[in-house]
Amino acid sequence: RYTSAANIGVYLWAVVAARDLGLVSEPQARARIQATLTEVTHLKRDNGFLYQWYDTTNGNVLTNPGQGDCTETTPAFDNCFFISNVDNGWYASGLIVVRQAMPELSHLVNSLIAPMNFGLFYDARAETHCNVNPAITGNQPTGQMFGGYYVGLPPDQGDNWTHYYHNGALYSDPRISAYIGMGLHQMPGNVWWRSWRELPPPAPFADCQSTDPDFSWQGQWPMAGSWQTYTDPQSRQTFPVWEGHYTYPGSDLTFIPTYSGGMFEGLMPNEIVPETSWGTRSFGLADARTAQVQIKYATQQLHDPVWGMSPSSTPDDTGGYGGYGVEGLAFPYFGTGADASHPNQGLSQCHGCATEDVVTPHASFLA
């Protein structure tokens, strides 16, 4: 008996889709959505953003599903004070869909959107032309989005940064927050260029060679690709961008990897932003290749009768959540320092971050 910001957001646009498909009537859809939005107005929020988990029996913030309601009053690095970037991206996407589909509810929707500022998730500290800024403790990849923030515990104070991480992979589900943040002019275009399509080699400047991280541990290395320079259409600032790709072993199928091999990571934003038609040579193409990789690996390597792996609820009804994905664990992996004679040939950026033993229907449906 729990829910999350992502669940609420996806439910909102699922009801709109059900109305459009004739599965529920207009009055039924409106009543469901209005009831949900009204309930959300009573939930504890921060800057309009929802917390990680909520108890559906009383609306209280949960520590974790099955672990009871939060009782802490002093900020701590746990879910009682965590505001998730990606989950609130999905929540906001649901609000935006409802506002467009049901203008009669726009006043209620606007009251929920108004306090939200996605700039809070953006790391606006000084950038360099390298992949990271070595002048900031922890060699931080500034210009990217944080995975979230802890209420009352900002990342730039003391050693708080050790509890933070960046959503550095652009080809993952947090890019919904980048779309919304840029669309609302709450994030600069920097986030688009500074986020990584793949984990890059050191930037092509002499001063970056010793400070940029060594990503040779990633799933596939060495990686084909090249550095390109892009000019942001609004700021006119230029950015070096690594454009690489992975290749499915033994084939000419090239693709952009997700971080942990999940279908959801790559394809979910296409449900809201029509990448298939707007980005036929970029993320629309990447989405199609992701589905091809999932199908090829599941049927040929795992010999599964079904395909579609992604993080999801565990199949044991305990309320748990597990990381599942196509990581290419059946292919060679040598770890850090892999080279042309001993290449890593995995299918996801993070080797071992997920297991390949669960197929989830929502991932198959996305394709």
Q: What residues fall within each predicted segment?
A:
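Ser/Thr/Asn(+Pro)-rich, low-complexity disordered segments
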Residues: 1-367
